[in-house]
Swiss-Prot record:
Disruption phenotype: Completely abolishes the production of novofumigatonin and asnovolin A, but accumulates asnovolin I and asnovolin K. The lineage of its organism: Eukaryota, Fungi, Dikarya, Ascomycota, Pezizomycotina. GO terms for molecular function: oxidoreductase activity. It comes from Aspergillus novofumigatus (strain IBT 16806). Pfam families: NmrA (PF05368). Belongs to the NmrA-type oxidoreductase family. This is Asnovolin J 5',6'-dehydrogenase nvfM. Disulfide bonds: none annotated. The active site is at residue 130. Pathway: Secondary metabolite biosynthesis; terpenoid biosynthesis. The gene is nvfM.
């Protein structure tokens, strides 16, 4: 989609962490008018987060993604771009959303991806589900962009004994081991930069019907620990484990998911460990591998993009910033 004077964007999940970053990124765009419509569940219409969106000029409307297709098509009739930041337990709702977007003539559909680059099947349970949705989008011939962002900064933040980084870690985040020798690089992105990347991507005709990998910096697990040790004077725990141990660690989570197949918590644990294996053992979370898979490289697309460095992020954490959020 070419840049025009006005762009109408609908977001599913605008009140969440990722959705909030996307809203911020869109509202920060200059040189054009951005009209944002947040699609929310009817029962959530008057929740504080949605009221705050309204106060920022976002139109918040009730939408039942599992309701009559005609009503959803009507809501999207004036929309140029649909962006999903839907809760990962509700990914299947993107199927009717895509159907409505196609019928409404939406010019670009961005599904909820925002993870590490990976092969189409067999890497993570959530990736498999997202690829099914992407296949459906492609069968519709609905223009799309698939965006991956690597690990989020706060998910890989090392702990220290004093607890100075604890407030910035996701709720319930376990201590992550270090895979192999800890020297495999991995792409990292701060949550507030994700929305800014997406705002650039949806205005870029080069990214239509493409996968895009954006990231801020590459770090190994050892480099993350070295950085935190240098800035805090404390040595993070380094628990090195073999590939066999990572596989066993993952299998424990898979067994729990098999016992509780409807548990979002069990699926979340499996997903975290699958991503850990893929990125920190198999080395898939890199621009080189992403290019091999056919992704466009955000560094090449947007060489002028400024971002929060990981070192500056850690400094801000040590100053008490970046409160806990979900992973």
């Amino acid at each position: 989609m070419a840049i025009t004077d006005t762009i109408n964007v609908a977001i599913v999940g605008a009140s969440g962490v990722t959705g909030g970053s996307i809203v911020n990124g869109l509202l920060a765009l200059t040189g054009l008018t951005v009209k944002i419509t947040a699609l929310t569940r009817p029962e959530s219409l008057n929740k504080p987060a949605n009221i705050q969106l309204k106060e920022r000029g976002v139109q918040v409307v009730a939408a039942n993604l599992r309701g009559p297709l005609e009503k959803l098509v009507d809501l999207l009739s004036s929309i140029d771009v649909v962006i999903s930041a839907i809760y990962w337990g509700s990914l299947d709702d993107e199927i009717p959303l895509a159907n409505a977007a196609k019928a409404a003539g939406v010019k670009r559909f961005v599904q909820s991806a925002y993870n590490i680059p990976a092969a189409a099947r067999g890497v993570t349970h959530l990736r498999d589900k997202k690829e099914v949705i992407l296949s459906h989008i492609q069968q519709l011939r609905l223009p799309y962009t698939y965006i991956d962002v690597g690990w989020w900064y706060h998910v890989v933040l090392p702990r220290v004994a004093s607890g100075r980084t604890e407030h910035a870690l996701p709720f319930g985040m376990p201590d992550l081991p270090i895979a192999l020798d800890g020297n495999i690089p991995s792409g990292l992105t701060h949550i507030r930069d994700i929305g800014r990347y997406i705002a650039r991507i949806i205005l870029d005709p080069r990214t239509v019907n493409k996968k895009v990998f954006v990231y801020n910096e590459l770090y190994t697990q050892n480099q993350l620990c070295d950085l935190v040790e240098r800035l805090t004077g404390e040595m993070p725990q380094r628990r090195y484990i073999s590939e066999k141990c990572v596989q066993s660690w993952l299998q424990e989570a898979l067994d729990e998911l098999e016992r509780n197949p409807s548990s979002d918590i069990a699926l979340g644990v499996v997903s975290l460990r699958e991503v850990f294996l893929a990125s920190n053992v198999h080395g898939t979370n890199t621009p080189e591998y992403a290019k091999y898979l056919g992704y466009l490289d955000g560094k090449e697309l947007y060489p002028d993009f400024t971002f929060l460095t990981y070192e500056d992020y850690v400094e801000e954490v040590l100053d008490g910033m970046h409160s806990q959020t979900v992973a």
